[in-house]
UniProtKB/Swiss-Prot annotation:
Protein keywords: Chloroplast, Plastid, Ribonucleoprotein, Ribosomal protein
Name of protein: Small ribosomal subunit protein uS2c
NCBIfam families: rpsB_bact
Compartments it resides in: Plastid, Chloroplast
Entry-linked PROSITE patterns: RIBOSOMAL_S2_1, RIBOSOMAL_S2_2
Superkingdom of origin: Eukaryota
Gene3D superfamilies named among the record's database cross-references: Glucose-6-phosphate isomerase like protein, domain 1 (3.40.50.10490), Helix hairpin bin (1.10.287.610)
Annotated source species: Nuphar advena (Common spatterdock)
PANTHER family for the chain: 30S RIBOSOMAL PROTEIN S2 PROKARYOTIC AND ORGANELLAR, SMALL RIBOSOMAL SUBUNIT PROTEIN US2M
Gene: rps2
Amino acid sequence: MTRRYWNISLEEMMEAGVHFGHGTRKWNPRMAPYISAKRKGIHITNLTRTARFLSEACDLVFDAASRGKHFLIVGTKDKAADSVASAAIRARCHYVNKKWLGGMSTNWSTTETRLHKFRDLRVRAEMGQLSRLPKRDAAILKRQLSHFQTYLGGIKYMTGLPDIVIIIDQQEEYTALRECVTLGIPTICLIDTNCDPDLADIPIPANDDAIASIRLILNKLVSAICQGRSSYSYIRSR
C-alpha cells in the first residue's frame, strides 16, 4: 500500500479540539500510549500519533476505493449524525446515523429482506399506489415507509456486506463493532480516551464528542475515498 500525503495539520486538529479527551477518571488504561498529558483533570491525546493513524487510515481507504470497494460509516449519536450523513453522501458511502439495528450485519439475510420491502414500498409510494388504498391500509404502509427511511435510509442501496466500516464513537457503536469483528470486516474507529484501541483494525485517537473533531476526521477520510474513487473510475475508463 503506497503512502500518500494527506495534508493533516496539527494546528488544524488543535483548533477542532481533536486533542481533548475525557476526564482522567473515565479512561481506559489501554489508551495510555495515545495520551500525551493531563490538563485540568482531562486527558490530552497525542496529536502526532493521531496524525500518523489518520494518515494510515486515509491510505487504506484510498487503496480500497481505488479497487471499487464499499464503505459503511456508522455514527448514531446526535453530535455525529449530521456529519456522518453528509460525509457518506459526499463519498457515495453507505451510512447508519440513527440506530444500529442488532444483527444488521451478522443477520444479513434479515436486513436484505427489510431492504427489499423498503424498496418495494418506495416504488409503490412514487407511483402513487398508496394514495389509492383504504386510508387505514395507506397509513400503516406510510408509517412503515417512514420507519424504514429513518433506520435503513442510509443503506438502501446496499446489496451486500461492506468491505470497510468507519465507526464514530466506539462505545456508542459497540454492537456494530462486535458484528464487524465477528464477520472479519476491517474497522477504522475514532477512539477517545475511554475506548479500547485493540478492538479496531485502525484506531484514530481523537475527541469523539466534539462536532468539529468528528467532522475534521471524516472530511480527511472522505477526501481520500473520493480520490480513490476517481482513480478507480479513470482506470476503468481506459
